[in-house]
C-alpha cells in the first residue's frame, strides 16, 4: 500500500507480482514435486482465509485494511499460480511422472492433486475482482504506455494500443487476439501484422493452452496457427472483443482466455510475455481509427469455409408428357470425373417459390456429384473445373427439350460407388479393433459398421472432406466432429496396416478412440460419461453431426412454412412429384455428402374418414426405425409392413380436420418416398418402458424394397411450374446388399454391442471392441441379436 499527497493507493500489479516472484525464488529452490504441492495447498488455504476476511468487511472497515487485504490476496494467488504454472512444469521429476505409462498409486495421487490445484486456480471467480480493485486504486502511468511495464490482466486504452502498434517496428513485439466470431473478424479487425481470431464459442474454462491450439483454432489459417504456436516469443498479447450490451458473453470468454493464457499455459508458459486487455473493445477502435481496420476478402478465406454461391441455373418448364425421361437418356450424360468441388446451393434472400411455394426457383447440383467430387479431389488434383449440375442442362439443351416436350422429372445417375479411379494404395477394407473406454461398445460397433461404407471411409481417409467443412453452419460444431472423426479413421487405417504387416497382437495395436469420444461428449453431454448408450442414437448423432459440419447450406435461413393455398395444391399432386418438390426445398437448407450417402425421406399422411381430405408432412431420415412385431419370428419385410401399415385414429386420437373444422375419425400412414444409397435400418426392439423384444428378425443378404417405395406418378403435372425436378437416384428397382450389422445382447442398460462387417476380399468379420476375427460360418452375421442393419444399394 502506498500513500501520495495524503491519498492511499494500492501497489501496482507489477509491484505485487514482483513480491510474489521474490517469495517463490527464495522459498522453493531445490524442493521436490510433493513438497511444492504441499506449499501450494497451504498457501491456497491462507488465500481462502483472507478471502473470507474480505467478504466480511463492512462500511466501517478502514480503507487501508481493504487495500491491504486485496494486495495480500493477489500476492498469495500469484505465488500459487507461479509455482503451479512455471515451477512444477519445469521439474524433471514432474515430466518423468507425466511420461511414465506405468504410474504407481503415489504418482497417480500426486498428479490428481496437481490437477485439482490447477482446476481450483482456473475456476477461482474472486481473483478477477481483486485485480480490478487493485487496478482501479493504483496510480495511473503518466506516459503513453509504449514504455510501460505491463502486468497480466492490465487494461490498455485505445490510444495506448495505437501507440504500441506504431512503435512495434519489427512487428514481433505484439500479438493481437480477436475474440469474436470469425465472420465478424473477417468483416473488420484491428490492422496489424500479427493478429489471430479465437472464436468465443471455441473454448471453455477447463481448457489449457494446448487445448486452444488443438481444438479452438480449427477455423484458423495456417498463419494464425503459427502465430499462436509462437505466442511465448511476443512481449505483449493483447486481447480484445466487442463490448456491446448484446455481446456480454464475448467479454466473459475474453476473461476465460486471459486466465488460460496466464494460469493454464502448461505447454508454453508465458515467462516473459504479458497478457493485457483492450479497454472499450474493438467498437471504440472503429470509431477512433476507422482507417486502421482490415477486412479479409472472401477469396482469401475460401480454404477455411465454404461461402454460399448463387447459381445462375436456367429453370426448365414442366411438361404434361406422359412418359418419364429414362435415366440413360443421351441428353443427360453425366460427367464422370470432377476435379473441383461444386459450389454450395444458396437460397437467396429474395428467393421465390413457383406455383404458390411448390417448386424452388433454383435446382441444386446433384448430391451424388458432391460425393464424387469429394472422392476424386486428391491433394495434388486442384485444377479448377466448372461443375455442370446433374439433372440441369445448359440453355441450348433446355430450349431443345422444351420444344420436344421433355418431361418433368429429369433423371440423375444414382450410382454412388467409390470412383474406379480411386486411390490405388488405399485398402478400404482395413480391420482393426477399438478399445472400450468404459461402456463405449455402443460407439465402437457403430464406427466399425459405418466404415463398411467405402465412400465415407475414402472421404475422411484422404482429407477431401476438409474442403467442405462449413464453420459457419448454424447447427455444426465448426468442424470439430468431422476433424476428430477423420483423425480416428486415419489412425484405424494406419494401425490396421501395421497389424496386418507385422501380425501383431490385437490388443497392442487396437486404437483408443479417446479424443473422438471427448469431442462427441463436448457436443452432446449424453456421450460424455461412461454410461451405456443406445448405439442407434449414437449413429444418428454422428451422421447428423457430420452432416451439419459439412452442410453447404448450413447458413441459409430455415424454410418458411407453406401457405394454406400451397399446401392444398400439394395434396392434389401425385406423391412422387410432391415428395420430389419437398426434397428440393429440403436441399436448400441441408446439402452435404452425408445427405447423398445416407439420407432418405418418408411421408406421414393423415386422411379424414368423413371428407377424405389429406394432410401430408415429409420427413428426411438417416436412420430408419422400423417396429418389430411381437411374434415368435418375423422377417425384415414384416417390419416394413408394420412400419407402413394403415392405422385408424379414433376415440382419444381423433384428428382435427382443417376442412371439417372439427376432430374427426381418420387414418394415418407412413409412406416411403425416397430410399437412400446406403440404408440404415434400426429394429425397434425396445418399447417405451425399455422392455426388449428379442424376437428373431430374419433379414436377407439381398433386400428388395421396390414394393415399399411410392410410385404413383401418372403423367399428370401441375400447371405453371417452371422448374424440372431431378430424380436424384429415385428410379426403381431398389435392391440392397447387406454390408454391416450392429448386434445387441442383454438389456439396454446392462448389455453389450458387437458388430459384423463385410470386409470385401477378407470376407465378413466379427468385431468385439479390441478383438476381431473372420466369421466361423458363412451366415454368422444373420443373428437374433441384430439391432441396426446397414445396406448399400446395388444395380442402380
From Swiss-Prot:
It comes from the Eukaryota. Its EC number is 3.4.19.12. One of its GO terms (biological process) is proteolysis. This is Ubiquitin carboxyl-terminal hydrolase 4. It comes from Kluyveromyces lactis (strain ATCC 8585 / CBS 2359 / DSM 70799 / NBRC 1267 / NRRL Y-1140 / WM37). It is found in: Cytoplasm; Late endosome membrane. It is a peripheral membrane protein. CDD domains: Peptidase_C19R. The keyword Lipoprotein does not apply. Keywords: Cytoplasm, Endosome, Hydrolase, Membrane, Protease, Thiol protease, Ubl conjugation pathway. Pfam families: Rhodanese, UCH.
Amino acid at each position: 500500500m502506498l500513500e501520495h499527497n495524503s491519498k492511499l493507493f494500492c501497489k501496482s500489479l507489477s509491484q505485487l507480482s514482483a513480491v510474489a516472484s521474490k517469495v517463490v525464488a527464495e522459498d522453493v529452490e531445490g524442493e521436490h514435486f510433493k513438497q511444492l504441492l504441499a506449499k501450494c495447498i497451504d498457501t491456497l488455504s491462507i488465500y481462502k482465509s483472507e478471502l473470507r476476511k474480505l467478504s466480511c468487511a463492512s462500511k466501517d472497515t478502514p480503507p487501508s485494511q481493504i487495500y491491504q487485504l486485496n494486495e495480500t490476496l493477489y500476492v498469495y494467488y500469484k505465488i500459487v499460480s507461479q509455482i503451479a504454472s512455471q515451477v512444477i512444469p519445469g521439474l524433471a521429476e514432474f515430466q518423468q511422472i507425466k511420461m511414465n505409462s506405468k504410474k504407481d498409486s503415489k504418482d497417480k495421487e500426486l498428479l490428481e492433486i496437481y490437477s485439482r490445484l490447477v482446476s481450483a486456480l482456473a475456476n477461482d471467480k474472486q481473483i478477477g475482482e481483486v485485480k480490478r480493485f487493485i487496478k482501479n486504486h493504483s496510480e495511473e502511468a503518466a506516459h503513453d504506455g509504449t514504455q510501460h511495464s505491463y502486468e497480466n490482466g492490465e487494461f490498455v486504452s485505445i490510444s495506448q494500443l495505437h501507440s504500441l502498434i506504431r512503435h512495434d517496428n519489427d512487428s514481433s513485439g505484439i500479438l493481437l487476439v480477436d475474440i469474436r466470431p470469425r465472420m465478424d473478424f473477417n468483416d473488420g479487425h484491428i490492422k496489424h501484422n500479427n493478429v489471430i481470431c479465437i472464436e468465443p464459442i471455441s473454448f471453455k474454462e477447463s481448457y489449457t493452452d494446448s487445448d486452444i491450439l488443438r481444438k479452438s483454432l480449427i477455423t484458423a489459417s495456417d498463419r494464425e496457427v503459427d502465430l499462436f504456436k509462437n505466442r511465448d516469443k511476443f512481449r505483449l498479447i493483447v486481447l480484445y472483443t466487442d463490448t456491446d450490451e448484446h455481446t456480454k458473453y464475448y467479454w466473459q470468454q475474453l476473461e476465460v482466455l486471459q486466465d488460460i493464457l496466464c494460469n493454464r499455459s502448461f505447454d508454453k508458459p508465458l515467462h516473459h510475455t504479458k497478457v493485457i486487455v483492450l479497454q472499450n473493445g474493438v467498437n471504440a477502435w472503429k470509431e477512433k481509427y476507422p482507417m486502421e481496420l482490415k477486412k479479409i476478402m472472401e477469396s482469401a478465406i475460401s480454404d477455411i469455409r465454404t461461402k454460399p454461391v448463387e447459381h445462375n441455373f436456367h429453370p426448365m418448364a414442366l411438361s404434361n408428357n406422359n412418359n418419364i425421361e429414362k435415366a440413360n437418356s443421351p441428353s443427360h450424360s453425366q460427367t464422370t470425373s470432377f476435379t473441383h468441388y461444386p459450389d454450395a446451393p444458396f437460397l437467396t434472400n429474395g428467393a421465390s417459390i413457383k406455383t404458390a411455394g411448390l417448386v424452388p426457383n433454383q435446382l441444386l447440383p446433384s448430391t451424388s456429384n458432391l460425393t464424387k467430387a469429394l472422392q476424386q479431389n486428391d491433394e495434388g488434383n486442384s485444377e479448377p473445373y466448372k461443375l455442370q449440375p446433374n439433372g440441369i442442362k445448359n440453355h441450348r439443351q433446355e430450349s431443345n427439350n422444351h420444344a420436344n416436350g421433355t418431361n418433368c422429372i429429369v433423371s440423375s445417375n444414382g450410382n454412388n460407388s467409390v470412383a474406379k479411379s480411386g486411390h490405388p494404395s488405399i485398402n478400404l477394407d482395413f480391420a482393426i479393433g477399438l478399445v472400450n473406454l468404459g461402456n463405449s461398445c455402443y460407439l465402437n460397433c457403430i464406427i466399425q459398421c459405418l466404415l463398411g461404407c467405402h465412400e465415407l471411409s475414402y472421404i475422411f481417409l484422404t482429407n477431401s472432406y476438409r474442403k467442405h467443412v462449413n464453420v459457419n453452419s448454424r447447427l455444426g460444431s465448426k468442424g470439430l466432429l468431422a476433424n476428430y472423426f477423420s483423425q480416428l479413421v486415419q489412425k484405424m487405417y494406419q494401425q490396421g496396416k501395421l497389424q496386418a504387416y507385422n501380425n501383431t497382437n490385437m490388443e497392442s495395436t487396437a486404437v483408443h478412440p479417446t479424443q473422438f469420444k471427448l469431442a462427441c461428449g463436448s457436443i452432446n453431454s449424453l456421450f460424455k460419461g461412461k454410461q451405456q448408450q443406445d448405439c442407434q442414437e449414437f449413429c444418428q448423432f454422428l451422421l447428423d453431426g457430420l452432416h451439419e459440419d459439412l452442410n453447404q447450406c448450413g447458413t441459409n435461413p430455415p424454410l418458411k412454412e407453406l401457405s394454406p393455398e400451397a399446401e392444398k395444391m400439394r395434396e392434389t399432386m401425385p406423391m412422387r412429384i410432391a415428395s420430389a418438390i419437398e426434397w428440393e426445398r429440403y436441399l436448400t437448407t441441408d446439402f452435404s455428402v452425408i445427405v447423398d450417402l445416407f439420407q432418405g425421406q418418408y411421408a406421414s399422411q393423415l386422411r379424414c374418414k368423413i371428407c377424405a381430405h389429406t394432410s401430408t408432412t415429409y420427413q428426411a431420415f438417416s436412420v430408419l426405425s422400423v417396429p418389430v412385431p411381437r411374434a415368435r419370428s418375423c422377417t425384415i419385410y414384416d417390419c416394413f409392413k408394420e412400419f407402413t401399415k394403415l392405422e385408424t385414429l379414433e376415440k382419444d386420437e381423433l384428428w382435427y380436420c382443417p376442412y371439417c373444422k372439427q376432430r374427426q375419425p381418420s387414418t394415418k400412414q407412413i409412406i416411403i418416398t425416397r430410399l437412400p444409397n446406403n440404408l440404415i435400418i434400426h429394429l425397434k426392439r425396445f418399447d417405451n418402458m425399455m422392455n426388449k423384444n428379442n424376437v428373431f428378425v430374419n433379414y436377407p443378404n439381398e433386400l428388395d424394397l421396390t414394393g415399399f417405395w411410392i410410385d404413383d406418378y401418372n403423367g399428370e403435372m401441375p400447371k405453371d411450374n417452371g422448374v424440372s425436378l431431378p430424380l436424384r437416384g429415385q428410379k426403381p428397382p431398389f435392391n440392397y446388399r447387406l454390408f454391416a450389422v450392429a448386434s445387441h445382447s442383454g438389456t439396454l442398460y446392462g448389455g453389450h454391442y458387437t458388430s459384423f462387417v463385410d470386409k470385401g476380399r477378407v470376407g465378413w468379420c466379427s468385431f468385439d471392441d479390441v478383438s476381431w476375427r473372420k466369421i466361423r460360418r458363412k451366415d454368422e452375421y444373420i443373428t437374433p441379436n441384430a439391432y441396426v442393419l446397414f445396406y448399400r444399394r446395388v444395380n442402380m
